[in-house]
Amino acid sequence: MAHPNPASTPAPLYLTGNKDGLRDFLNKFDVFLFDCDGVLWSGDHIFPGTVETLELLRKNGKQVVFVTNNSTKSRADYCKKLQSLGIPSTVEEVFSSSYSASIYISRILDLPKDKKKVFVIGETGIEQELRAENVPFIGGTDPAYRRDIQPQDYKLIAEGDSSMLDSEVGVVLVGLDFHLNYLKLALAFHYIKRGAVFLATNIDSTLPNSGTLFPGAGSMSAPLIMMLGSEPTSLGKPSQAMMDAIEGKFRFDRSRACMVGTGKLGGTLGVLTGVSSKDDFVSGAVRPHAYLDKLSDLLESGL
């Protein structure tokens, strides 16, 4: 999708220290969707004023939703992380890419009755959310798939032998998998070639950790994209599919929802505590509507 010409896009409002501007901005929205890492915390360090800012929003009747592309954790696991950092939260306030994918498969995809099973490349977070939606699956953390491919496997896969390929698989779902191997990729490729829907929890190419970058969930999909010559439907942020799923669950007016983030992918409110600089927000190809030095600057609104 082509990005808008920066010259034709209004410069974002800088709201830090602008009490009236902050109050007017907050009053435009009923729902606040939070990117977490870089907005609420960095690593295991919560930013000062985060809890108080969330309390301010809730006190003023705003709905708070925590949005994450982390597919390795279930919503319950992610809620525990929030609470361990001192952030009050409930499972229903968490919307993860693994949950988004599970909702999409169970409630939106119209799969044939004999093709309801999902082949998973990913970790327990995906499995827990699929299980909660009563979606049958294979692969994932099953030790049977954590092995080298054997010479006889090629012929069995090519022939569609039931010992290698399950005829009931109608979806291949790819997330971050710490045990990705040739066998999993070969099976995923042949399921998709046989008509399975190609989905990804998210397409982030890298995963930040310990001050550097590691392969992300998008890097798990990359070999399949190369083989197939086609892209998966992504169920993570900032995809339209994830926004549709969030809107469907929480039943809000999208024009009254504020997405708070750190990246260069747009959103409503940007903060400078993550990966973006002021120049990115002011001169970048995709700009937020407004930005702050840090999230806790919202406390200056006096609401």
Predicted regions and their residues:
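Asp-based, Mg2+/Mn2+-dependent phosphohydrolase catalytic module
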Residues: 2-36, 41-62, 71-95, 102-303
